[in-house]
Amino acid sequence: MSTYPKTAALMKRGTDFLGCETAILCGAMSWVSERNLVAAISNAGGFGVIACGAMTPELLDTEIAATKALTTKPFGVNLITMHPALFDLIAVCRKHGVTHVVLAGGIPPKGSVEAIKADESGIKVICFAPTLALAKKLLRSGADALVIEGMEAGGHIGPVSTSVLAQEILPELAGEHLIFVAGGIGRGEAIASYLEMGAAGVQLGTRFACATESIAHPDFKKAFFRASAREAVASVQVDPRLPVIPVRALKNTGTEEFTAKQREVAALLDAGEVDMGEAQLQIEHFWAGALRRAVIEGDVENGSVMAGQSVGMVTKEEPAADIIAELMSQCEAALAR
């Protein structure tokens, strides 16, 4: 018998789909969601997800193998749809028998979902849906489950809040489809409310970034512990021509450097030195480098400290298993009221 019977009952569709004990996914955070944190979350009954980010197929191959050495539980891999080697990365996931692939960063390119599912691989595909119309389209295109992520989340974000997305999408789709809610979730009471609305589970990133098993630099973690919700701000788009997806991170010098980088890329566009695709790639490379500086090197002033608005609820370093247990007990208490 479950310690959290009410929560377990509402999460059952999600846990059956994921193959784990609690329908709590860890959001894929570049440089943070690697073998150690992913394995710790899966071993604790949650669902860890490797952030492939800008990894080459060779690096992803190594990371999946290293994760499998640390856990026998299921875990997923998050792939960025605009990655130039997307189909090679899919082949790596298939080779390793990864059970779930999460496609993030836009509409999956033609043939990508088919490539994941070819030869009856049994791999489940999870996609991000920022609107109801796109959610329906993704489900028609072969997505097995969706994550709806509000603007409170850290990293790349859309323009609509989690609570509004949940109200728009869950009543329409959650009866027949698996929908996971993400963005700004820091406590179990919030999980309870989304489960009661029909969500199959939830996804949290910020809450796990400072887990004991997270390899993030101690100074990166300290920045989280000091921060309040209002310090996790979204980046500003300088030039309307640049298709810059806003990024939520803690306000610092790096935030201003990103504004300057946009101006520099816009000037290159004006001069005809780069096309729109190259401009977007330069912006993404900026983020990848800035994030590494913060997470790995601990440069929290010039690097990008990507964090969701739930950062104010992250006050100490604790094991992933303790974080999951606390979320589950808070959720159960809320459902029992």
Language model region names:
Residues 2-178:
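Active-site entrance/lid segments in N-terminal catalytic domains of soluble metabolic enzymes
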Residues 32, 185-186:
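Residue-level detector of alpha-helix initiation sites
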Residues 159-178, 186-337:
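Conserved active-site-proximal phosphate/metal-binding subdomains
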